[in-house]
Amino acid sequence: LVSVVAIAHNEGNRIFSCLWSICENNCHFPIEIIVVNNHSTDNTESILKKLGVTYYNEEQKGPGFARQCGLNHAKGKYCVCIDSDTMYPPLYITTMTKALQQKGVMAAYALWSFLPDKHYSQTGLFFYEKLRDVYFNIQHLRRPELNVRGMVFAFQTDTAHKVGFRTDIIRGEDGSLALGLKKYGKIKFVRSRKARAVTGYGTISA
């Protein structure tokens, strides 16, 4: 079993697309989909009810609290973290899971692309992503945890329970967990486009 855990804060306009992309994934193993509604004040919860997806409310606001809530409820051997404003390719779950099945791998992270809009052109984003990817390849050699983003992050569930997400920081809870997991094994950099997610430009500042 693989647990796919999404966190959502006021994502009523985007969460359906995210969950649709996950449901369209090609998997040859069972998965469970969990959504953590993190103190949303829009129609996120009503959409989750209509969709019939398993969800939990986390009233303590912040990605650390939300991701820890998801981890607490995950039943799978592997946990795949996603964000509700992001879409995933058809082989995303399979590709990330295969990375975790490699000997000694405790966690895996992938890359992502951006949707162009009025603020960021397709050409500008193309060159930004190329430069970022080169930087990530260099940084992975010594500090891979600094590359990790929760929307493209997967890990061994049992070991993650030993470490846990930090809830005392505004951001960086994903990299902090990766740093803790590094004590138990390798962090795998999944460069394949089969695991490359697509998200909005807000992640540029993350």
Where are these regions (language model features)?
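A conserved acidic beta->alpha catalytic loop
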Residues: S21, N37-E45, T86
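Acidic donor-binding loop at a coil-to-helix junction in glycosyltransferase catalytic cores
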Residues: R171-L177
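Short, flexible, basic/aromatic active-site loop/helix in glycosyltransferases
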Residues: A110-P116, G124-L146
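Short aromatic/hydrophobic "clamp" motif used to bind/position activated sugar donors
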Residues: C79
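Acidic helix N-cap motif at the loop->helix transition within catalytic regions
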Residues: R14-F16, T41-K50, L91
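Glycine-rich, basic loop-to-helix element that forms the pyrophosphate-binding segment
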Residues: E58-A74
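Short, well-formed alpha-helical segments that are part of the catalytic scaffolds
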Residues: N10-E24
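Conserved donor NDP-sugar-binding/catalytic core segment of glycosyltransferases
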Residues: L91-Q122
